[in-house]
């Protein structure tokens, strides 16, 4: 009988190739996901800042003073001066925005600017 040491056995192929492929694809997938996430965050920040830029505020303040002077007699016959001051302040905030309306022209990419 022949010993088992004398039998030619082929050496097994290394399984490192599949491990490397899996590690590379998982790493690239994570990098692509992080790049996509960074792009989405950048887009949202850009959209929010553009929304703030389009809005312009106009504040109108009307202020009126009314003074009344009256001379009245006191209980002992003394004359005294009474001043009454009325301060009337009106503040109006007019916010103007550029709004895009696709319904009027019907075309894609067309915009109509309306100010209110």
UniProtKB/Swiss-Prot annotation:
Disulfide bonds: none
Membrane topology designation: Single-pass membrane protein
Parts of the chain that traverse the membrane: 25-45
UniProt note: phenotype after gene disruption: Conditional double mutant plants lacking both TED6 and TED7 have aberrant secondary cell wall (SCW) formation of root vessel elements.
Residue spans, topological domain Extracellular: 1-24
Residue intervals on the Cytoplasmic side: 46-116
Domain of life: Eukaryota
GO biological process, one term: tracheary element differentiation
Keyword tags: Cell membrane, Cell wall, Cell wall biogenesis/degradation, Developmental protein, Membrane, Secreted, Transmembrane, Transmembrane helix
A GO-annotated cellular component: plasma membrane
Tissue distribution of the protein: Expressed preferentially in differentiating vessel elements in seedlings.
Keyword ATP-binding belongs to the record: no
Compartment(s) where it occurs, according to its Swiss-Prot or TrEMBL record: Cell membrane; Secreted, Cell wall
Subunit relationships: Interacts with CESA7/IRX3, a subunit of the secondary cell wall (SCW)-related cellulose synthase complex.
Cited function: Involved in the secondary cell wall (SCW) formation of vessel elements (e.g. protoxylem and metaxylem), thus promoting tracheary element (TE) differentiation.
The protein's name in its UniProt record: Protein TRACHEARY ELEMENT DIFFERENTIATION-RELATED 6
Organism encoding this protein: Arabidopsis thaliana
Organism taxonomic ancestry: Eukaryota, Viridiplantae, Streptophyta, Embryophyta, Tracheophyta
């Amino acid at each position: 009988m022949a010993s088992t040491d004398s039998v030619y056995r082929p050496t097994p192929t290394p399984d490192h190739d599949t491990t490397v492929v899996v590690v590379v694809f998982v790493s690239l997938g994570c990098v692509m996901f992080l790049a996509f996430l960074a792009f989405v965050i950048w887009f949202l920040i850009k959209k929010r800042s553009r929304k703030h830029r389009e809005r312009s505020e106009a504040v109108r303040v009307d202020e009126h003073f009314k003074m009344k002077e009256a001379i009245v007699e006191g209980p002992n016959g003394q004359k005294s001066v009474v001043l009454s001051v009325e301060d009337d302040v009106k503040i109006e905030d007019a916010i103007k925005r550029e709004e895009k309306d696709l319904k009027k022209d019907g075309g894609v990419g067309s915009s109509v600017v309306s100010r209110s």
